């Protein structure tokens, strides 16, 4: 009988012709095997041809798409118009891919379905033991060793079962005996031995390994610097290309390119992704006009206080009580528009450091600006601090008191003190010689006049003449 040894991965199987058959029986098996071989070979080649035809059809469809795309490209080569090509973000493939199927998928072995029966007329030959023994020298023989395995299994429980999942299921409880290999009668709880501490029994302890050199020799390992693997893109140097704006009549170049779409931010982080926002524009015309009207109306700055009435020109003091010379009086810190508005109201005597021809202005703003230019402006004016003036007055009063007390018996000193007090009374700086108390209106006027800076002498020549008049 033929042996059908087919595997699961094989789609076809062929029977083998056994030796030592009768002639008629051998002929029948040979014919049946050859017929089955022809059937299998025909099926194999038909399946291969079918797969080749399928692949050929797919290749023809791909070639058709390629030829169509090539024809479109050839047509677009001569056009001088700009063409936008929209590419899909997804790969042009079906959602569900077709799984690969084997060429021999679904093949059936017809030999297993066939059950051919032939009636043999010839009889079996008698068995020849000597011929069988001679054939054992040339043919492999399967020896049955099952009996020996059964005899060796009598010592234990036998082969290991398939449902063992752990070592504890293999060994005897609380022991190291494998009962499947050697079966022994042993009480697992009787032979329990407690192990004592090996240090108490004098056993040698296992020594630890030596410490590393970094601990024994106090050496410090050098810290290795970690390498930086971060991706830092660099734009590099972009070459400057000087080309004309338009190149007409070039083959393969469109002449109606219009780049009006926003390209979006760049991919390089070093390049500025977003343009710098522009600041909002402020309307300054209304603000300037309002400020001008306020300055003209006198609402931008408080109006300056009215100047006091001009006192009579004081005589030049003696060298002993002479105050520090001041070339120019400090002008009032008022902007030009405000001063123009208040020039009509103020007194001409308020311009102390200006020349004489500017005191009586003829035409408003022009004469005022001219007087400021002639006086040298604010930068050339020698301004003095109010605190320094007060300290100087205080020192002068102390010196006068010391001189008055120290030279009381001298006739010339008494005359000098009286003359100085008289001059102060005339100039408004202090009480006159005939006034005994300062509680009257003259004392209040003197205190007010002390807060006002003194007027400088208008001219050196006039000062000399006044001094001569006083001495005479």
UniProtKB/Swiss-Prot annotation:
Residues 301-319, 327-336 have a biased composition (Pro residues). Its main location: membrane. Residues 289-365, 377-412, 426-472 are annotated as: Disordered. Keywords: Actin-binding, Endosome, Membrane, Protein transport, Transport. Residues 364-386 form the WH2 domain. The keyword Acyltransferase does not apply. Acts as a nucleation-promoting factor at the surface of endosomes, where it recruits and activates the Arp2/3 complex to induce actin polymerization, playing a key role in the fission of tubules that serve as transport intermediates during endosome sorting. Component of the WASH complex. This is WASH complex subunit 1. The gene is washc1.
